[in-house]
Amino acid sequence: MEETCYRLTSNATDVIIALAPFPEIVYWGAHLAWFSPQDCHSLTRPVANGRLDVDSPITLMAESGHGLFGAPGLEGHRNGQDASPVFTPVRVEQQGNALTIFCEDVNAGLGLVSELVLTDSGVLKVRHALTNQRAQPWQVDRFAVTLPVPERAGEVMAFHGRWIREFQPHRVALSHDGFVLENRRGRTSHEHFPALIAGTPGFHEQQGDVWGVHLGWSGNHRIKCEAKTDGRRLIQAEALYLPGEMALEEGETLHTPWLYASFSATGLNGMSQQFHRFLRDEIIRFPGDKPRPVHLNTWEGIYFNHDPAYIMQMASRAAELGVERFIIDDGWFKGRND
């Protein structure tokens, strides 16, 4: 590894990753008009008053073995041993805006592969893969993706809800400690949407710097935003494992879910545009330029009165009007009697 600084760039966003001495995102924000690897040292944090002369980095895995007082990105053990791994980079592969970092801790017998991809839309994709390299099982308690956000991200927004009251936003000032979202229902729902946004206080649709994450996982999960006493802030997102649920045998590998992250300097609207473009470019499978069929849904036309003759008459009349997709909807509510 000759280079110690790597850049992922798009029209609106830059991500700078330093490798020496350990992998760390030193910048995630607006596009930098002028930057070279030699400028990486200018992004190093100064030593805070009353702190250690050597900073404890918020690495990609936020290991407690670095002396980071906070929630590490990886928690686990091998029958009480190898509980504080420190991952050292051994190889890096970069293809355009896709970076893969191979790390290991030979003392703990663990290997880690980190994938970071900055898409054309500006959405950053991150995930990790942990491999047990020893004969004894390694118990995984937590395995999270960690992203740093700057001190000016002083407000957090998340979403809650229920049936007919979905996606209700709520905001919390983030001045110290942290904000945690947990879902233990076994699936995603309106009660626990797997996303979180941190931004400058008072951010809204058209204004403010915002950093948002969405965890690509439909089971139990935990997302948190933590403010450290030295001013740094971080977002962590993970699948939530119950006691004893996840143990790696020798040679087995566990992946985190993909974390989809976005930075916008133009408020929530700019973030929405990035995620919308990302969905169209990489998630949606049908041809995006193909006109969508005109459809008719019967629910509010007939509710539970599903008479076959009447429905066929509706379908025939709808076809005459140009309807291309006819949807029979019984609502799935309490009036269903079959």
Task: Give residue ranges: language-model regions.
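Short acidic, Pro/Gly- and aromatic-enriched capping/linker segments at domain boundaries
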Residues: 1-6, 229-248
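Short Pro-Gly-centered flexible turn/kink motifs
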Residues: 12, 75, 84-89, 246-265
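Conserved, mostly hydrophobic/aromatic
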Residues: 12, 128, 251, 296, ...
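Primarily single-stranded nucleic-acid-binding OB-fold modules
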Residues: 226, 231, 301-302
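Aromatic-lined carbohydrate-binding/catalytic grooves of carbohydrate-active enzymes
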Residues: 287-338
